Amino acid sequence: MQKTILAVAACCACGAVQAQSSVTLYGVADANVEYVNHVGAPPQASNNFNPGPANNVFRENSGGLSGSRWGLRGTEDLGGGLKSVFALEGGFNIDSGLAQQGGRLFGRQAFVGLQTNYGQLIFGRQYTSLFSTVANFVPARFATQYEPAALITGFNYREDNTVKYTGVFGPLTAMAHWTFGAGLTLPRTSPTAVTAGGNGEVPGEFRRDTGYGAALSYGAGLFRLGVGYDQWNPTIGTGSGTYKKAAVMANFGTDKANVSAGYRWGQNRDQNGALLLRDDFYWVGGNYKVLNDLTLTLEYNYQDVKSLAGSPNFTNPWQIAFIADYALSKRTDVYLTTAYAKHAGLALDSAATGYATSLALGNSYALGAGQSSMLGVALGIRHIF
C-alpha cells in the first residue's frame, strides 16, 4: 500500500514538473525548382576572380520562402515570473541532406537564457538586433530565394558568442546585443578586395571581430515604425575594420493588405580607416491577400553605391520581385516566385555585396561575363512542422 501511495505521489510530482516545462520540436521543409539566365560563377581566387561565361541553369533548390531547418526550443518556469529559455536550430539543404551554415549542427541559432516580465537575456549564436527588427518591415520577410537579406542587414546578421537583450513594453520593442567574436569570414571576391573576419575572442585583442547593435520598433494600430544600428569590427590584416549599418523603416497594414518601406545607410572601412564601401539601400513593397488562401507579394529594391574600393564608378543595381503563395493547409503551401535584377545578379548579388548570397546558398546568382541583367523564376512547396 505504501509503495502504491509513493508511486502515485511520484507520478503527480512528475506531472507538476512537466506542466512547468516545455520542449518543442519544429522545422521547415522547403524545396523548389528554378530557372535562371545569365549565370556565371562567384569571382574568387580559385577562378582568378573571373565570373566566366554566362549560361542558363535549371536546378532544384532548398529554401524559397523559408530556409529549410529543424530545431528544438523550450522553456522552464522557475517561479516568481522567471523562466529559462533555449533554442537549438540547424539549417539544411533538403535537396541534398547536407548541413548549411558551413556544416554547423546548429548554425541558424543556438542560445540559452532567462526571461522575466522586464525582458529576455540570451547567450549564444543568434541574430543581430538589426536583422531581428528589419524582418518585420520587409515584404517577403527575408524569403530565401530573392530578397537580399545580407545586403540589407550586413553579412554578419548571425553572430557567434553573442549576448542579446529583448524587451517588450506595450507597443514598444527594444533590442540590444554584443558579440565577443562573430565567427564569420568573408572571402576575397576581387583582386582589390580584402579578406575580412575571424573567430574573435583573441587574447590581448579586445576589439577584434567584436560587434554590437540596438534597435527599437513601435506599433500603434495599423502603423509601425522601426530604427536600428549594427556594427561589426572584422579582422582585416593585422587590425580590425569597421562595418556599420543603420536603418529606418515603416509598415502600414490591415488584415488583407500591408505596405512596407525602408532606408538603410552603410559604410565599411578597413583596419587603416580607408573606405571600402559606402552605399544606401532602399526598399518598398507590399502584400495583398486576394483570397483567404492566396497572398501576393511585390517588392522593389535599389542600391545606391557611392563608393566601392575607392571608386565612385559603380552602376547602381535594382531588382523587382513577385511571390504568389497559396496555402493548401495551415502548415503546407505552394508558391511561385520570380525576380528581375539589373546591373547585378538576383538578390542584388554583386561585387558590392561580396557575392554573399551566392556563397551562402551554394547556388550562384553572379552575373556571367558581359551581362547586365538576370531573370529567375521558381515553383516550390513548403511544409512547416
Identify the residue ranges that each predicted region occupies.
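Gram-negative bacterial Sec-dependent N-terminal signal peptides
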Residues: M1-A19
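Detector for outer-membrane/organellar transmembrane beta-barrel domains
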Residues: R207-A327, A339-Y340
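Outer-membrane beta-barrel "beta-signal"
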Residues: L328, A369-F385
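Outer-membrane beta-barrel architecture
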Residues: G71-R73, F111-G113, K164-T166, A215-S217, ...
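Residues that define the transmembrane beta-barrel architecture of outer-membrane proteins
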Residues: A54-S68, L105-R108, Y157-N161, V168, ...
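Transmembrane beta-strands of outer-membrane beta-barrel pores
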Residues: A31-N37, G90-I94, Y127-S129, P171, ...
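Outer membrane beta-barrel
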Residues: S21-Y35, P53-G181, S217-G221
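Transmembrane beta-strands of outer-membrane beta-barrel proteins
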Residues: V23-A31, G80, S84-L88, L121, ...
